Amino acid sequence: THDPSFSIWCGADHLYDKDPVHWSQIRQQLRGYVNVDGVVYSFLGDKEFHETIGQTGVDVTATSTTYTFENEKIILNVKFTSPLLLDDLTLVSRPCTYIDYAVEKKENCDFVVASDLVSQKQAKLIGCNARRPEKGDAPAYNYAQMGRAAQKPLGGSGDHVTIDWGYVYVASAEKGAVCTYDAANEKL
């Protein structure tokens, strides 16, 4: 939660019970899946027709929330971090939340973690898929982005106004990670 425009959270006991919502109860479609040895498990958002991977814990701190999921083959940690450090006003004013995924194998298995960030705004979207080369000490990484073609930051007002400007980025420096903007389905 940053401000009334950029404010989503899980309104259920388990992260996979339903989609996250804005404070006004407007659904924000954000989905997370982990494929373990060919079986798809839901861990974030409405599980739809998928099995779920058991949520075994949640840890809330001042700047982050970490959910732990586990089955017989893996332990998955999903960490949402909003760097709201009060001694850095520039950082506090940045409407940005980071989502980190960490998987620990309990036994030998293949896995893929995937997220779908789906726009529900009635607007023309633009996006791209790209690779940033290695630069100095920073490693190379793949990324994708999505945002409205026409943006009016803070151009709306009212009780049920969600953020409708800026860009969503998905990035990973992990070898083999795929970050994709899907224009046809308006999702990352």
Task: Annotate each predicted stretch with a short phrase.
Residues T1-L188:
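Accessory carbohydrate-recognition regions in carbohydrate-active enzymes
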